[in-house]
Amino acid sequence: MRRWRIEDSAELYNINGWGLKYFSINDKGHVAVTPREGNASVDLKELMDELQVRDVTSPVLVRFPDILDNRIEKISKCFEQAAEEYGYTAQNFIIYPIKVNQMRPVVEEIIGHGKKFNLGLEAGSKPELHAVIAVNTDSDSLIICNGYKDESYIELALLAQKMGKRIFL
């Protein structure tokens, strides 16, 4: 039987299928994350080992806000380049569908970093709209209402509009 190689880890984790430039296999064969290009990588196995030493038990949720920030910047830059190439001059907005990840720290990071990129939020249901109204404190930010709109959903959207939110039904 042959020795385990780094390539075996890359294949096992299918790192090339989903890791982009953020996740890789390091020289120890461990999954590593580089949240921001040019910055240091974090060995996730070593991180978990260190957490165990500190009596932190798994499962552990590890967030990488720099990856979120970088993806927002990338989307904005790509659209900017395409707009320039095709002579598109209208204002544009990046819209984050809250159903992708509704966790407050994630949404707050996206809103906070996305402010300078005209980032708005999309709600496809009344519970999502409640969440969006609660976290979206910037009156300039868009709120897009998608999905089935019953009377109470429309009433909530109109109430949010009266509160100064920029709502699109």
Model-assigned labels for residue ranges:
Residues 9, 24, 41, 58, ...:
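Generic serine detector
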Residues 12-14, 70, 143:
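Short acidic/polar alpha-helix capping motifs at helix-coil junctions
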Residues 1-4, 10-12, 40, 73-75, ...:
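A short linear-motif detector with a strong N-terminal bias
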Residues 87-169:
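Active-site-proximal beta-alpha core segment in soluble small-molecule metabolic enzymes
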Residues 8-11, 17, 80, 84-86, ...:
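Residue-level detector of functional hotspots within protein domains
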Residues 12-15, 21-24, 49-52, 134-136, ...:
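A general structural signal for short secondary-structure junctions and capping/turn motifs
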Residues 1-40:
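N-terminal basic/disordered segments at the start of proteins
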Residues 25-39, 44-102:
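Low-complexity, highly charged intrinsically disordered N-terminal segments
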